[in-house]
Amino acid sequence: MQKKINIAIDGYSSCGKGTLAKALAKSLGYVFIDSGAMYRAVTLHMLQSKVDVNDEAAVVSALANVQVGFENNAKQQSEVTLNGVSVESEIRNIEVASKVSEVAKIAAVRTKMVALQQAIGSNRGVVMDGRDIGTVVFPDAELKIFMTASPEVRAQRRFAELSAKGDVVTLEEIAKNLEHRDTIDASRENSPLMLTGDYRVLDNSDLSKEAQFAMAMGWVNEAIQCI
């Protein structure tokens, strides 16, 4: 039996991390975990509960009532759950997107989510994407990929995604939201997004999904051969 590895995919929002992670997991027969969805689920709970996400004490207090997990839908696709209920659709709206970085930077929130993420990946065979997967969650991951793309490309991708779902947003709103999230993700005190020397960098501004997948699979095969 081929040995399994953990694959960490980090990068800014709307860089295609989830798309690549899902494709790799499906091809390898690994478990895909969208760590960002976990923080979005926590954020959704705060919004539903009328908790001020800028009030750290209030968020920490409400965190005791949050249980985040995953379940497979009818298509055997992993969906994030909030207190036992799938919220895969609800967590993708612009309101959650505009607040998630504020919630995710809180130490108690990250501690709770990281512990869950590490438990999921303890037996290897996991592809997880996020901001701190290779630096904090799986610092010993056999393969770490850092994904990036130009701000213009990222904004266009996000605009297309939200428009397809019927959300009424402007490209300018999305660009500002991405810029705001980038600043918080890179500058927060707890687990900031960071490119370290052990990452493979994948700039997909001008790459097709097929080209990205082929490049990443090459790195996967190299990593497996090294264990």
Q: Could you say what each language-model-derived stretch is?
A:
Residues 18:
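Walker A/P-loop
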Residues 15:
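ATP-binding Walker
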Residues 9:
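Hydrophobic anchor at the beta1->P-loop junction of P-loop NTPases
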Residues 71-72, 117-124, 131, 135-136, ...:
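Small-molecule kinase domains that catalyze NTP-dependent phosphoryl transfer to phosphate-bearing small molecules
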Residues 88-165:
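ATP-dependent NMP and nucleoside kinases share a basic, alpha-helical "lid"
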